[in-house]
Amino acid sequence: MNIIYQGISLSDKESIQSIKNITDKDTNYFMIKCASSLDGNIEKEKNFDEYISYAELHSIPYGVYYVTNSTDIKQTEKEADFVFELLKNKKMQFPVYIEQVNTDKTKIKEATDSIVAFCGKAWYNKFYSGFRCTASYLRNNLDFNRLRRYNFWLVCHSDRPGNPVIPFGMWEHTNKCRIDNTLNMFPESYCIQNYPKTIRQNNLNGY
């Protein structure tokens, strides 16, 4: 596995104070949680704007993700519109991901339809997109063959990624990354795709 970039994830679990000493020498990129939706109530992350401002001020590339438990296409499309409105006038060098948290294994088609709908909306709005989940969620809760065309951000906290049923472009390998001069531990991901190059060449994500 050829690791091109290493980056950390940020959400409201962290704070702007926890990253104030981080520079582009400490990490190659941020993955910033922008919103979450539980039962149709989508809310923006409180620290989202501050994280974006910090990344831009310190020239740290970034992508975003949002979390939802929706398996309804119309609801997911509404959430997508909310997310893409947040991303207006921003230049992101990494994709925008949907993380779906649905425990109902009888709704495989609906869950997959929702991810496809989100990624379709993303493409329409000129965003490079994908989905984020564990290998077991991919295998048991989704029709993974329909998702092969999209960027896959694997969550597997281990020293090896295992054998997920489709290739991944990014792998969150730990939630206990320690960065010098900071008190917090962060989720860290390895990126094996040159997303910044692909995004710029195709004029996506604000480019």
Name every feature range the model reports, one short phrase each.
Residues 1-12, 143-207:
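Functionally critical loop-and-helix segments that line ligand-binding/catalytic clefts
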Residues 1-128:
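Substrate-binding cleft of extracellular glycoside hydrolase catalytic domains
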Residues 39, 71, 138, 161, ...:
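Flexible, glycine-rich phosphate/dinucleotide-binding loops
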Residues 66, 133, 156:
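Short beta-strand/turn micro-motifs composed of small residues
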Residues 71-74, 106-107, 136-139, 173-174, ...:
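Noncatalytic linker/hinge segments flanking ATPase motor cores
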Residues 124-139:
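Aromatic-lined carbohydrate-recognition surfaces of secreted/lumenal glycan-active proteins
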